[in-house]
Regions:
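Short, flexible active-site loop motifs that bind/organize anionic cofactors or intermediates
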Residues: 16, 39, 99
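Short acidic-aromatic low-complexity motifs
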Residues: 1-29
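C-terminal ligand-sensing/allosteric alpha-helical core of TetR-family HTH transcriptional regulators
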Residues: 6-10, 52, 82
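Generic, low-specificity signal for short hydrophobic/alpha-helical stretches with a mild N-terminal bias
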Residues: 8, 31-38, 83, 94
């Protein structure tokens, strides 16, 4: 799996409500011991990413929302970055940002850092 495939599998996992499908996508995209940095803190393991998805991404008070990759994947070597938006059912952007991911030689994301919002 290349960088773009891993990132797109991660985004698809964030958007699916089927727990089994989400777990499969996360297993394809993320190393078992992935380190996940979000605005809410640091988590380790696929379970921490799954918890973030179900509680924060899918549990948003605005109702059903989805994560959309808004840029190409810039991948110099083992690092990748991409832009994203979090949009509601009407297509309005609620939040946007850039994520940076470290990708192993096997194509698994073993670290991901979420940068949400605009820089001052």
């Amino acid at each position: 799996m290349d960088h773009t495939d891993a990132i797109d599998a991660f985004i698809e996992a964030a958007n699916t409500t089927d727990a089994e499908r989400r777990a499969d996508l996360l297993a394809r995209a993320l190393a078992r011991d992935v380190v996940f940095w979000s605005p809410l803190g640091r988590g380790e393991g696929r379970g921490s990413v799954e918890d973030f998805i179900t509680q924060v991404v899918q549990g948003h008070p605005a109702g059903p929302c989805r994560l959309v990759r808004t840029t190409g994947v810039d991948a110099p070597g083992e690092w990748a970055r991409f832009g994203w938006s979090y949009v509601d059912a009407a297509g309005r952007t609620l939040l946007s940002g850039v994520d940076v991911a470290h990708v192993t030689p096997d194509g698994d994301i073993d670290e991901i850092v979420v940068f949400a919002g605009e820089l001052a």
